[in-house]
Amino acid sequence: MAKKTKTPAANLQENTSGAGSAASPPKTCSILPDTTLGDDVALVAENMEAILTSPSYSLAQEDRALLDRTEMRGVRMLLELGKPELAFQADSITSTVIVFGGTQIVERTAAERRLSEARRAVALSAGSSPQPAGATAAVSSASPASHASHASHASHASPVSHEKLIRELQRSVQLLSYCRYYDAAREFARLVSIDNQCDDQRDYVIITGGGPGIMEAANRGAFDVGCKSVGLNIKLPGEQQPNPFITPELCFQFKYFAMRKFHFILRAAAVVLFPGGFGTLDEMFETLTLRQTHRMQPVPIILFGRDYWSKVIDFQFLADSGVISDDHLSLFSYAETPADAWKQIIDFHEERKRRGS
């Protein structure tokens, strides 16, 4: 039996049978249209207004709805790559010193105010709530006032909420002791800034995440001595405003963590990590990993406050366990004073210059 072959017309019909294809036969409208609409002056004017106000007619770069689309993510990331870069070039910023640290570590007056509020909250709830284990010690160590009058101020807080207040009091006591790190970050930024911004060329410019706590302290230190500093803020639900000590033209807001991290690392000459939480740990491990894998320039990575960091993570245990090499322990160092941290940075780069690396 002879094999049937399709005619070219049949192939065309098969390949173009999709809706709206050019090969679809035209449909005949059973209702005759009004052929005089183009002569309706009012209608034409209305259509012209619609053309001029249509999103499709606006310049693509000015179409916010377009830029916010998921498909435009790459364009948005490119903008976040380019905008800070142009600002850094305009201000002749050739290198930066990153300062990371916790948002909850604030200056002493703020920490004392927070502790006072925590004491007051515990005192108001103590009369009607059973004391959880350890609460008595926390209250008495945090407050010199007598607790005999607590009953007269008692609220109707539940045992759970009272326990939470006790926990907040304990945290406030601890955070008060960390005020020294705020002072140290501020002094460190003063030392670095005043040594490196004496002319139009700006080296070792302080750069932070732009928020409160240790970040504020570092920007504030540069501000103290009339020097510039950078703040890379991130747009998050209910998140921070920038601290008031950042140089205005060097304060940026990012949508993407990836682009923010890129600008942290790009010009980094040193990374100094003060005590902090998950965000600080994230930056620490990312920087260590980039150095471990030789994916960023050699920089000193300094952990400020050995006592804190040795409790947070046991690096020696990682080496002893074989999951990192002994050589990886040399990727970072510790510092206890601002002067020591700054000297380590100077020594690191002088040694690299001496070796020609």
Label every PLM stretch briefly.
Residues 12, 303-357:
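C-terminal functional extensions of proteins
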Residues 114-117, 223-224, 286-291, 317-320, ...:
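Short, solvent-exposed amphipathic alpha-helical segments in soluble enzyme
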Residues 255-302, 352-353:
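Active-site/ligand-binding-proximal alpha/beta "capping" segment
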Residues 89-92, 197-200, 223, 243-246, ...:
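Solvent-exposed alpha-helices and their adjacent loops that cap or buttress functional pockets
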Residues 2-66:
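Non-catalytic accessory regions outside enzyme or core folds
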Residues 205-208, 212-274:
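Phosphate/pyrophosphate-binding betaalpha-module
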